[in-house]
C-alpha cells in the first residue's frame, strides 16, 4: 500500500510531498512528522527506501506507507492531554509522533503481538529521547508498550479518547474495538479494505466515515491456553506523574517560554521548517531544419550544449554556497539555559533527560 506521492530525498522532502498531495493538512501533524525521522525506524541497509511512499516489512518489523500514517494522524484529531491506544504498535514510529502532540499529561499506550518488535520499539524510543534534535522542542508523552494480542485485552481495561488499529479488522470484531473507546472518542481502523473513522457520539451511538481505500493484513486470531480459553492481556496502568517529574516538566516549560519571549523581544522570528529546493529539470533546446518537405528537430551543437550545462552547474554551486552561508549552526537554547542554572550537575542532567546534546 502506498505510492501515492513522489519519493523524497530525506524526511523533510517526504513531508513536503505529503503536504503537496494533501495527506498532511494541519500544522500540528506536520510538526510531528518533521520531528521524527522515518529513516531512523528502518534497519541498517534498508534506509534507502525510508522516504518512498511505500510500506516496509522485514521479519516481524513493519511500517505502513507514509500516506497511511498521514491520514491516520489527521483522522485521529489529536489534542494535548488525551489518552491514546495503538493496537499493533509495531516499531513505535506512530506512537512517538502521537506523543509529541499529546504532551506530558496525555496517556500513550501500545500493544504489540511480537516481543522482539516491542524491544525494537523501546530501543528506537530511547534513541529518540537521547539523540534527536527535536526532543527539546516538544513536551512529550512517552509511549508505554506491552506484548500481547489486541483481541485479548482484559475486560476491565480502561477506555481511551483515541484508538488506532494497524491491522485489518473483521466485521465481527468491530464492536469489541468500540467498547475500548470513550464517549466522544475517535477510533481509526481498517474494515473491509477501507480505513474508517468511527466517532462515539453516545453510549450506544456512533458515526462512521470511510477515509481511504487500503489493504492491511488481518488481525492475528488469539491462541488458546491449556484450558481452551485465551489468556487476557493487561494494558499499562494510567500512572500519575510524581512530583519530581512534574517539577522537571514545569521548569523546562518555564525556560522554553522565557526563550520564546526573549526571541520575540529581539524580533527574532521562530524558524520555520526549510522549504525544500526542488531539483530543476534541464530542458534541451532544439533547432529545426528542413529535410525534403519535413521539419526535423536537431539538437544544438555540442559546444553550446556544454556551455549551458557548465553555466547551470556554476549557478547551482553559487546557490549552494549562499545557502551554506545563511545556515546557522544548530543551537539548543533550552539546554544552554538549563546548564546555566545554579544547580548541582546531577539535577541539570535530570532536567536534560541525561542527553549529551
From Swiss-Prot:
Residues 85-94, 160-164, 181-191 are annotated as: AdoMet binding motif. One of its GO terms (biological process) is protein ubiquitination. The active site is at residue 64. Pfam families: PCMT. Residues 301-317 have a biased composition (Acidic residues). Residues 341-344 are annotated as: CUL-box. Gene3D superfamilies: Vaccinia Virus protein VP39 (3.40.50.150). Keywords: Cytoplasm, Lipoprotein, Membrane, Myristate. It is a lipid-anchor. A lipid is attached at residue 2 (N-myristoyl glycine). Its main location: cytoplasm. GO terms for molecular function: ubiquitin-like ligase-substrate adaptor activity. Component of the probable ECS(PCMTD1) E3 ubiquitin-protein ligase complex, at least composed of CUL5, ELOB, ELOC, RBX2 and PCMTD1. Interacts (via the BC-box) with ELOB and ELOC; the interaction is direct and stabilizes PCMTD1. Substrate recognition component of an ECS (Elongin BC-CUL5-SOCS-box protein) E3 ubiquitin ligase complex which mediates the ubiquitination and subsequent proteasomal degradation of target proteins. Specifically binds to the methyltransferase cofactor S-adenosylmethionine (AdoMet) via the N-terminal AdoMet binding motif, but does not display methyltransferase activity. May provide an alternate maintenance pathway for modified proteins by acting as a damage-specific E3 ubiquitin ligase adaptor protein. This is Protein-L-isoaspartate O-methyltransferase domain-containing protein 1. The lineage of its organism: Eukaryota, Metazoa, Chordata, Craniata, Vertebrata. The gene is Pcmtd1.
